[in-house]
Each structure stands twice: as C-alpha cells, then as structure tokens.
C-alpha cells in the first residue's frame, strides 16, 4: 500500500464567504513512514475566459488568448521538513479568505466561456527516489449582497399580433392567446424561479410547454466583446395538449455552480435569461423571453 495525501476542510459543503477563516487538515496516510522536505500549500482563485468560436471565429478564438483574472494567490507553509511516522498523521491549517491587494472576490461559477474557481493545492516533496504526494481540492466561494433587490414581477400576454421576428410563412398561423406572470425578475439564486402560465385559447393542438434557463456570457478582448448565449437546462412544465384556461405552475431550481449572481466586470459579464416555450404539434414554436438578475 502506497502513501497518500488528502485535504479535508472543516465544512462538509466547502462553502465560504469573503474574509471568513478557512480551516482544515492535511491528512497523510503511510504504512511505513517517510522523510520529507516540507509540506507546502498554495491557495489560488481565478476567473478564466475563452472566446466563443461562434462569436469570434475559429482563428480569432485560437490566437486571441484572454488572460485570466487572478483573484487569490498565496503560499502557506503547513509543516517544515521532517519525518512522517507510520499510520495516519494530520497537519492542521487555516487562512483568511481574501483577494489579492484589495481585489474583490467573485462567486464560484462553472460556465462555458467563463469560469471562476478556487482551489487548495498541497504538495509533499519526498526523497529523490520517491514521487511527491499531491492533492488539489476545489472549494466554493459565495458572495452575498448586503441588501436584497426588489422582486420586480412581470406579467405577459402572447397573441399572434404580439410576436416579433416571425417568419412570413408563419404569419397566418392559427389563433392563440397565452397569459401568465413570473413572480420575480430579480431572483435570489437560492430560491426557485416561480410563476404561472395560462393557455387561454389555442386553435392548434399543443405538444409541450417548456421553461429554459439561458446563460449569456460576454468576454472582452482586443477587438471588442464576444457575447454568446447557451442553454443551462430545460424543464418541461406541460406535456401534450394542455387544458385551456388553467394555470400551469412555473417552478425551476437554479442549479448550483452552473448559475451564480449576475456578474458585470470590465473583463467579462455573466447574465441570465429564461424562455417560456410553447411548442405546437404542427411544429410551430413561440417563445417569451425574460432577462433576469440573480443575486444572493
């Protein structure tokens, strides 16, 4: 059995806020023990960006590399050179979570063209003939607002006359009248997105009613800004030719890590939208778009 190194934090969910104290242990398990040249830890956090090939083109996205935004970077000595005895040995550590030189921390986010990650990297250098022990552990940073935003509910009415960007071939589609409301367009990221939709009237049979969550990521580069929208998730809230004049609940949980509070920085933006989509059996589809602001 070979020696192993692991990093454990004092919080199971590994969620921390700016300026909190992060505590944990480096745990080394060794059947025979060994000598080492020190136990070192590195804490790093950065926002990494890349250009969309669709928005910037394949050539531009390959050669216009966008430098990452460094948020946190420091080294932390855990133990000096010495010996690890046989069995399990634990080395405690702690540090304050704060940005470099007054840099504000951004919330953890795993996107397509923008990602914000925070990691603890721990290395134990052993003798010349032995491989070093290495462990990388990601932890999550949440950045709450001091005051909540107003809910800003919004009602909607959809008829053939209210549609925009309609192909000429669909201008004579059968009549429909759809109403509804969303309870918040300023949404706490830890609460569900809710509302209701009512099919007041529809001459054509309906196939499904769906709710889409969209991320809109914008990345600045030397020649301008590349903006790209991608789907995070799609929730079916109605199946088949749904009943007319009956409220269909809108309910969607914002997925952890793949969503975050709306971020607007000089280097990039991460924004969110929801689409209510009604798909008819004849293949026609209508979409109502709601830009939303997420906050914690």
Regions found by a protein language model. Give the residues of each.
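C-terminal beta-sandwich interaction modules and adjacent acidic
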Residues: 1-296
């Amino acid at each position: 059995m070979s020696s192993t190194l692991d990093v454990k934090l004092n919080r199971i969910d590994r969620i921390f806020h700016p300026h909190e104290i992060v505590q944990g242990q480096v745990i080394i398990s060794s059947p025979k023990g060994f000598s080492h040249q020190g136990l070192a830890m590195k804490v790093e956090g950065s926002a990494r960006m890349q250009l969309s090939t669709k928005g910037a083109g394949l050539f531009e996205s390959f050669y216009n590399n966008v430098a990452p935004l460094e948020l946190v970077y420091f080294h932390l000595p855990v133990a000096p050179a010495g010996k690890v005895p046989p069995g399990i040995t634990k080395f405690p550590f702690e540090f304050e979570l704060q940005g470099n030189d007054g840099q504000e921390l951004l919330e953890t986010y795993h996107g397509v063209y923008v990602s914000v990650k925070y990691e603890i990297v721990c290395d134990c250098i052993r003798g010349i003939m032995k491989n070093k022990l290495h462990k990388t552990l990601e932890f999550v940073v949440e950045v709450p607002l001091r005051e909540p935003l107003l809910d800003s509910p919004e009602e909607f009415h959809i008829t053939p006359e209210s549609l925009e960007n309609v192909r000429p071939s669909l201008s004579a589609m059968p009549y429909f009248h759809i109403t509804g409301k969303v309870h918040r367009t300023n949404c706490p990221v830890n609460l569900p997105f809710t509302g209701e939709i009512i099919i007041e009237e529809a001459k054509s049979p309906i196939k499904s009613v769906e709710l889409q969550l969209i991320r809109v990521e914008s990345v600045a580069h030397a020649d301008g800004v590349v903006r790209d929208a991608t789907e995070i998730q799609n929730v079916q809230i109605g199946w088949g030719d749904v009943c007319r004049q009956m409220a269909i609940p809108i309910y969607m949980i914002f997925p952890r890590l793949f969503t975050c509070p709306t971020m607007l920085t000089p280097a990039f933006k991460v924004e969110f939208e929801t689409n209510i989509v009604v798909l008819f059996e004849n293949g026609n589809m209508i979409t109502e778009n709601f830009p939303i602001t997420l906050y914690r």
